[in-house]
Amino acid sequence: MIERGKFRSLTLINWNGFFARTFDLDELVTTLSGGNGAGKSTTMAAFVTALIPDLTLLHFRNTTEAGATSGSRDKGLHGKLKAGVCYSMLDTINSRHQRVVVGVRLQQVAGRDRKVDIKPFAIQGLPMSVQPTQLVTETLNERQARVLPLNELKDKLEAMEGVQFKQFNSITDYHSLMFDLGIIARRLRSASDRSKFYRLIEASLYGGISSAITRSLRDYLLPENSGVRKAFQDMEAALRENRMTLEAIRVTQSDRDLFKHLISEATNYVAADYMRHANERRVHLDKALEFRRELHTSRQQLAAEQYKHVDMARELAEHNGAEGDLEADYQAASDHLNLVQTALRQQEKIERYEADLDELQIRLEEQNEVVAEAIERQEENEARAEAAELEVDELKSQLADYQQALDVQQTRAIQYNQAIAALNRAKELCHLPDLTADSAAEWLETFQAKELEATEKMLSLEQKMSMAQTAHSQFEQAYQLVVAINGPLARNEAWDVARELLREGVDQRHLAEQVQPLRMRLSELEQRLREQQEAERLLADFCKRQGKNFDIDELEALHQELEARIASLSDSVSNAREERMALRQEQEQLQSRIQSLMQRAPVWLAAQNSLNQLSEQCGEEFTSSQDVTEYLQQLLEREREAIVERDEVGARKNAVDEEIERLSQPGGSEDQRLNALAERFGGVLLSEIYDDVSLEDAPYFSALYGPSRHAIVVPDLSQVTEHLEGLTDCPEDLYLIEGDPQSFDDSVFSVDELEKAVVVKIADRQWRYSRFPEVPLFGRAARESRIESLHAEREVLSERFATLSFDVQKTQRLHQAFSRFIGSHLAVAFESDPEAEIRQLNSRRVELERALSNHENDNQQQRIQFEQAKEGVTALNRILPRLNLLADDSLADRVDEIRERLDEAQEAARFVQQFGNQLAKLEPIVSVLQSDPEQFEQLKEDYAYSQQMQRDARQQAFALTEVVQRRAHFSYSDSAEMLSGNSDLNEKLRERLEQAEAERTRAREALRGHAAQLSQYNQVLASLKSSYDTKKELLNDLQRELQDIGVRADSGAEERARIRRDELHAQLSNNRSRRNQLEKALTFCEAEMDNLTRKLRKLERDYFEMREQVVTAKAGWCAVMRMVKDNGVERRLHRRELAYLSADDLRSMSDKALGALRLAVADNEHLRDVLRMSEDPKRPERKIQFFVAVYQHLRERIRQDIIRTDDPVEAIEQMEIELSRLTEELTSREQKLAISSRSVANIIRKTIQREQNRIRMLNQGLQNVSFGQVNSVRLNVNVRETHAMLLDVLSEQHEQHQDLFNSNRLTFSEALAKLYQRLNPQIDMGQRTPQTIGEELLDYRNYLEMEVEVNRGSDGWLRAESGALSTGEAIGTGMSILVMVVQSWEDESRRLRGKDISPCRLLFLDEAARLDARSIATLFELCERLQMQLIIAAPENISPEKGTTYKLVRKVFQNTEHVHVVGLRGFAPQLPETLPGTDEAPSQAS
């Protein structure tokens, strides 16, 4: 790391109070402590004087008059010195460890002005052991010493080996050495720089915030960018000279420029208007045709909308009519649903009562069963009693009739007897006395038939009897059931009525079972009926939409026809879509192709124009790009040859000019350095001595001296030797000849003259042979002769160079034209004519548009037919599945029939529901009604008679059967005597008879007991019947109410009613939705019709206006075309590339040209009047008259002797060839010299940014600096608003102010000043000239505003002003500012001095007692951080803990005052962490 230079000591010699005193300076802080008048300010004044020995600046205010602004005459310095020689010297050591002593010799000048003479000097190479006081003093004895004057000091130092002493005649040189050696931070080139440095030191010395520094911080902190200013000045000077030359050329070209300007602007003015009118005429025709097409299309759209409006209005009326019916149906459905719900609630009540009745019925049946069981037991008891009676009777009969069979013989006898008995019994029983065994078989069949009949009758009566016996108690119950079902009737009718009721019950039950199927069937038929009605509605709607009535049989065929039509239309639509896509694609391709051709057409036309011009210029016809490139190669070869020849001529011309310039030098010196060397050596050039030699002798003397003819003749070569040492600025070979210039001759050489040559014997062993030069240059006469011949040659060369330059320029212009043509137009120049292709494509586009329009119309009709067919098919798809319904004419009748059957079934169901239980109970006991208990005795008698009859018939049949069976027994007559009775059997029968009689007695007693219990059961049964009848009556009332409601309340009735209501609601909602849609569509259609009507009216108006305009403009356009053709200017005016520009662009082009023409013809009365007349937009032919007038005017002014053409354009091109070369050369030179405004802005802005960054880095070093309430110090750098706006305009909006920077009358500085005034008109520039203002604006420092801010207490950041700070705070803040300035100077100067030098850094502070201890500590810390030396002068309040402290006490001894000095090194303990760069020495006394 480079060490920073340091001030080692300050030496005061013969100052007031200090005879010879050296103050060793601390590396950081040196404190001068002492009371008032102790010499602290004198010490600092000596330091400042040695640092800045400028009497115009030195002004020590604390020793001058109080309140004075100018101070005393000596400005405080004269009184600080003693009489005689005084010195102030600074001993320093720089970063290179070089010891340098700088100082001043001061001496009071006698006189009333109290002046002081100052001489600065410097000493280098002084050994470290030599003290400064030893140099400038001489010890006379132990108590006396003498101060050496400056010349003795110089001699003393020169006597010392390695020591260099330099005395300076100017302060600038003194400061330059100090800067180079790293003693001061900035190079002080001028008095202004010294003033700034002194103001810095002065501000440091007296403390506080220096207004002189704060007001001009820019000058202190920002380096001057003089290189930029110098570059601008050189640029402006060169530009000024160049512009003067260009102005001269422009004056020469005035006629040509005027002609060219007039022709170009007149052509632009008239051609733009001509082509605009042509374009407008075409546009108006296209618009008229377009208006007509749109008018036709709008009329068709309006008619279509009107038809659509009528259809939608009709449909809306239909929906409005249907909405009322649907609302009524919906209300009826809602009412029906409410009735169904009421009926269902009634039905629920009925079901509850029926449940109660069922429960009572069950209890009644149970009680009936109990009664029946009791009756059965009663009947059993009766049967048992009767059986006992019968058994008794039978036993009695058996006892009477029974015979006992014996053994086999007895059995035969018995059988015989039995057969006889059987025959007798048969005769008796059958009442057939004539009956025999043989005839018994025939009578058997007869009596068997009787038996069968009697058995059947008996069985019937037995059944009746049995039933009567078992159901005697149920007859009343059955009778009551029949009465309940049928009503009152006679008891004898009960059986027949019951059977009829049972048969009717079966039928009713069968019908009741059909209720659900009938209901489902009815629902199905009703659904089909609704579908039939919907189908009829759809069919009616379909017929209405088709506009024709169709039979049902025709619908399928129509459906197939529509399907076929849809298929064909779909194919047609699909094909039409593809065809339309193909047409549109072709149209888009055509449009794209036309657009690309229209974009290419201007390029192609420009290429054709360029190609025609090239053909006219070179006289060649080009048919392909190969021809152009081949001709360009030939042109390049010609150009190369011409350039080579021109360069050779130019090089020869330059060589001639250089030779003329060299020969024109005074004294014949070809090298200016020889003149300087001759003056330095005190000699004379040899060519000056022989300047008067004649032209004839010139070849001889030139050959005689040979290479030494440019030698210098000096009186004494020995005196030149010391000058030759270290000589570098001289020719490679420098000849010196000793001799007297006043009497010099050629005797110095031994010469032998030969034929046109000489032999010079330079030495015994060295000769030189030189021939006479063909063109001698030795002597003024020879040089003048040579110059004359060179001038003649130069004239020839100049003329040849001009001719060649003209040819090269012409060739280059032609080459440039070819190059431009190749670069810009070659690719398209030989392509086909885009305009012809555009015309073909436009005709094809028109055909496509017409075909597309026809196709759209056809496609629209097909689409309408397709939609209609689709709607028809959709409707038929809904109708065809219902054709069978439509064809079913009996559906309504079947519905009525099923409804009637359902009513019957429901009646039967209600009958079954009402009487089903009674019938079910009646059916098992209906038989009891066959016999009335009141006829039971008769029935018994009938049964007994029938039984007897059956028994008799059986006996008769049995008897006959027995006879028939015993027919063989009649032969056993012999065994009859053997039959006998059996007395034992009779005894057993009697015993059984007694037992049977006892059993009969017991059965009769049981019968009487059970009869009483049966009576109790009958009473319970009667109560249950009463409750049942009451419930039954209530149930009948509810059923009658349900019948009065008139609604079938089955399980699905509510769901069907709700579905019906929801269907009607959905239909009503759909109808309303469709009605709303139709109303909206109708409103939109009406609005669309209104819009179309308004559009139609506007189109009609626009069409008729456009048509009238086209017709009106046609007459004027015909007059214009006739005038153009008559005057032959169509080629100039009909610029086809302008046909592709818009009307606004052409009008703008014409207006711009008109403005330029007004200025161009302002001095020509005739053209001015014609131009004014041509401005009438209603008379376009007058513009043609103006163009013809301009051409005529230019033809009259063409010099036919120079330019042999009748065309002004060709004349201008020929005039331009010669002058353009000079203009291009000077313009290119100007462009090389000129600098753009954007570059200036960038340079200034970059410089500002660099300096702002530098200031920001400086601010970082002061962030932790605090004094009193001041917590931090910073420097704000802002760009002035007015200057920032200037930079923005220069960089971004410079095109708007090119009138200033492109002006030939203004330099760049003046243009910059004018721009500043234009941007800031409110600023008063005073008496300063624009050049001065512009030069100030080129200095970036004038763009910046700088101010110092402090962070003080609770106030935050505020501007640093002395009035806002305490004294100590102002001192600390001012010191911070000064440190920042010093750092800035070092950064600025780093690039100017050596990289290995870091300059000394030292500041002062007088009267430091105004700072508190904390601020003093802050200063110490600042010095440590910045490696800065600080000299503080203060009273006794400074504690010598750090740095070096000198105690100064002024004493008087024997009328002589001197200052007693005691120095102390800091004795404070070293901190644990020291700041970088600090190195405190141990405490010691000095």
Swiss-Prot record:
Compartments reported by the entry: Cytoplasm, Nucleoid
One annotated GO molecular function: ATP binding
Alphabetized Gene3D superfamilies for the sequence: 1.20.58.850, 3.40.1140.10, Immunoglobulin FC, subunit C, MukB, hinge domain
Source species, domain of life: Bacteria
Keywords per UniProt: ATP-binding, Cell cycle, Cell division, Chromosome partition, Coiled coil, Cytoplasm, DNA condensation, DNA-binding, Nucleotide-binding
Binding-site residues for ATP, renumbered to this chain: G34, G35, N36, G37, A38, G39, K40, S41
Residue span of region Flexible hinge: 666-783
The keyword Cell division is assigned to this record: yes
Gene Ontology cellular-component terms listed: cytoplasm; nucleoid
One GO term of the biological process aspect: chromosome segregation
Coiled-coil features, chain-numbered ranges: 326-418, 444-480, 509-603, 835-923, 977-1115, 1209-1266
Keyword Protease: no
Matches recorded under NCBIfam families: PRK04863.1
HAMAP family for this protein: MukB
Similarity annotation: Belongs to the SMC family. MukB subfamily.
Annotated domain remarks: The hinge domain, which separates the large intramolecular coiled coil regions, allows the homodimerization, forming a V-shaped homodimer.
Subunit text: Homodimerization via its hinge domain. Binds to DNA via its C-terminal region. Interacts, and probably forms a ternary complex, with MukE and MukF via its C-terminal region. The complex formation is stimulated by calcium or magnesium. Interacts with tubulin-related protein FtsZ.
Described purpose of this protein according to its UniProt entry: Plays a central role in chromosome condensation, segregation and cell cycle progression. Functions as a homodimer, which is essential for chromosome partition. Involved in negative DNA supercoiling in vivo, and by this means organize and compact chromosomes. May achieve or facilitate chromosome segregation by condensation DNA from both sides of a centrally located replisome during cell division.
Name under which the protein is recorded: Chromosome partition protein MukB
Gene: mukB
